[in-house]
Curated annotation (Swiss-Prot):
Any matching Pfam family: ATP-synt
Transit peptide residue numbers: 1-45
Keywords, comma-separated and alphabetical: ATP synthesis, CF(1), Hydrogen ion transport, Ion transport, Membrane, Mitochondrion, Mitochondrion inner membrane, Transit peptide, Transport
Similarity annotation: Belongs to the ATPase gamma chain family.
Coiled-coil stretches: none
Name under which the protein is recorded: ATP synthase subunit gamma, mitochondrial
HAMAP family linked to this entry: ATP_synth_gamma_bact (MF_00815)
Predominant place of localization: mitochondrion
Record note on quaternary structure: F-type ATPases have 2 components, CF(1) - the catalytic core - and CF(0) - the membrane proton channel. CF(1) has five subunits: alpha(3), beta(3), gamma(1), delta(1), epsilon(1). CF(0) has three main subunits: a, b and c.
Length: 326
């Protein structure tokens, strides 16, 4: 609702007439370009009512951005605790099965995690840019690269130029509060519908409200893990573990890989959600400050316009009185 109100104020602002020699886009100035100054050379031609309407619109936008900042801060606190707790879930698997981005495989699936909503800075563009770079680095005559997209914003960008490489699209993942059961269902859906040798999970790792790092986690298929362990590479230490029970080594690796993927994906989704809310909080704070600066400039314009109008009226009264006396 806050975003809809923001759009309504933007349309209202764009429709209002403004006769100053220097046109003013108040919405853009309050949200994007705080450095734009209002031209004051034509204050006499500006109606005080027009300036008051502008001030009212900017105040409404400022109220919306402040509310969105508080909502983002509340969501961030809730998600951040769960994201920190989830790190202890996937780290043992990374220690056991490794995170080996340099392993050469033929079928790469790049899982790009983004948000469903905007007004959160450049986190979605960063994820998409990182995914495209990974796609480019792993390209080759005998290699196949596919995308799995989580989130509307990555979908909107990747569909334009990589539609043929998109294997699966999942949106509205954050419609309900994120939990492990929900993400594990998504992981099962990916494992059942996508063939891969390596899953490259791209997300934004949360560091602080104003800082996030584009990150890639790699999950290998059970076949590649078994091949690498037998070849004595980075996963050669797996043979030192004794497998108990009736299950074969391949079955154990299958189960471990599936659990590793769901755990890593759960952490990645939470980290990206933290980064999203932090970026939105920062963006709305900046927008609120810009709106305050815009109000200061509009107040100055209003006062000068009103002063010019009063001065003009006084001159007309004095001139009329002088004419009558003369």
């Amino acid at each position: 609702m806050a975003m809809a109100a923001l759009r309504r104020e933007g349309r209202r602002l764009a429709a209002a007439p403004f006769t100053s020699p220097t046109p003013l886009n108040a919405l853009r100035s309050s949200l994007v370009s705080p450095s734009e100054e209002i031209g004051l050379s034509g204050v006499r031609s500006i109606s005080t009512q027009v300036v008051r309407n502008r001030m009212k619109s900017v105040k409404n936008i400022q109220k919306i951005t402040k509310a969105m900042k508080m909502v983002a801060a509340s969501k961030l606190r809730a998600i951040q605790t769960r994201a920190e707790n989830s790190r202890g879930l996937w780290q043992p698997f990374t220690a056991l099965l490794g995170d080996t981005p340099s392993v050469d495989v033929k079928k790469n699936v790049i899982i790009t995690i983004s948000s469903d909503k905007g007004l959160c800075g450049g986190i979605n563009s960063t994820s998409v840019k990182t995914s495209r770079n990974i796609h480019k680095l792993n390209s080759g005559p005998e290699k196949e690269n596919k995308y799995v997209i989580l989130g509307e914003k990555a979908k909107a960008q990747l569909v334009r130029d990589s539609k043929k490489d998109i294997e699966l699209i999942i949106t509205e993942l954050q419609k309900n509060p994120l939990n492990y059961t929900q993400v594990s269902v998504v992981a099962d859906d990916i494992l059942k519908n996508v063939e891969f040798d390596a899953l490259r999970i791209v997300f934004n790792k949360f560091q602080s409200v104003v800082s996030f790092v584009p990150t890639m986690s790699t999950v290998l298929s059970p076949e590649v893990v078994e091949r690498e362990s037998e070849s004595g590479g980075k996963l050669g230490d797996l043979d030192s573990y004794e497998i108990e029970g009736a299950e074969s080594k391949s079955e154990v690796l299958q189960n471990l890989t599936e659990f590793q993927f769901s755990s890593v994906l759960f952490n990645a989704v939470l980290e990206n959600a933290c980064s999203e809310q932090g970026a939105r909080m920062s963006a709305m704070d900046s927008s609120s400050r810009n709106a305050g600066e815009m109000l200061d400039r509009l107040t100055l314009t209003y006062n000068r316009t009103r002063q010019a109008s009063i001065t003009t009226e006084l001159i007309e009264i004095i001139s009329g009185a002088s004419a009558l006396e003369g």
